[in-house]
């Protein structure tokens, strides 16, 4: 009788490294390790040999970067999705795509089970398992971190050392790091105390603002229907544009985020993020929307932005609601075409200029010079009608 097969999400980190051996021993199963390239900078060429050495029978490496940018990141950017107005959702956006890739691999390899290395009090367990249920409800899902005997990262490290499993986490380097092209999340260690400033060694790519260049960097980003298409006058793919903005932003200390956020499971957590390109692009996109969107659309879209961010954060990417919101967002983005010029300086992003063929800014109406075409006399009648309801209310209630 052939062994059962388990497809697992494999990153090469502490949890998934020891998970291979633990699952193999517990279920006497073959392990198919799946790694998705979402633009992480850490070395990935040695992951296959590491997974096999740890006990996996097969390793699948999938380059998901193009799909990640075009089908996930750009949708979130067009929606203006920032969780609780801060987090650009790098990890949260990557999880449904990675989970989908694991399901596809599992079905192709004849696996009967899926496994992830998410903790029992984190968000990612929800994101993976809801996606698994959406795409392959017939496959059994295993969550080793919710049931195994290890109670701390220290005990996991000890298990790894006992079984000669190579891991980068040590008691001297206790950070848990997740990375993709849209951002890096850093947690654990001293970061769990919200009164402790993040040590410099916690940051992975960004220069400290104090040590950033004394000369500002100026960038020009061109958008077409809400999607960035060129940087400094050069047309480029979305992937290349994000990579370049990450380099420029990181060098200038842009994109460091420190927040207390509300997790799906009901607790608050302290998270450190590095997201240079995401910070720059969300800022530029929002300023172009200010120029091109009609007032009621611009103001209402803020509600949609938060709803969209919540959907991503809560693991509901494949829900009908997300698809329905996409239809609204896509309609709003038709005029969001134009150029935005920004200054990046010592961690800050500031606006230098913007223009668009669909600009709703009319200088002749806005100016206070003699070229003013605004009908000032019309204001009196407008104000009378605009305030008539409150005037009537006041007259009635004052009289009583």
UniProtKB/Swiss-Prot annotation:
It catalyses: L-citrulline + L-aspartate + ATP = 2-(N(omega)-L-arginino)succinate + AMP + diphosphate + H(+). L-aspartate binds at residues 119, 123-124. This is Argininosuccinate synthase. One of its GO terms (biological process) is argininosuccinate metabolic process. Belongs to the argininosuccinate synthase family. Type 1 subfamily. Pathway: Amino-acid biosynthesis; L-arginine biosynthesis; L-arginine from L-ornithine and carbamoyl phosphate: step 2/3. It holds the Pfam family Arginosuc_syn_C. It comes from Pelodictyon phaeoclathratiforme (strain DSM 5477 / BU-1). It is found in: Cytoplasm. Homotetramer. GO terms for cellular component: cytoplasm. GO terms for molecular function: argininosuccinate synthase activity; ATP binding. L-citrulline binds at residues 87, 123, 127, 176, 185, 261, 273. It comes from the Bacteria. Its main location: cytoplasm. ATP binds at residues 9-17, 117. The keyword ATP-binding applies.
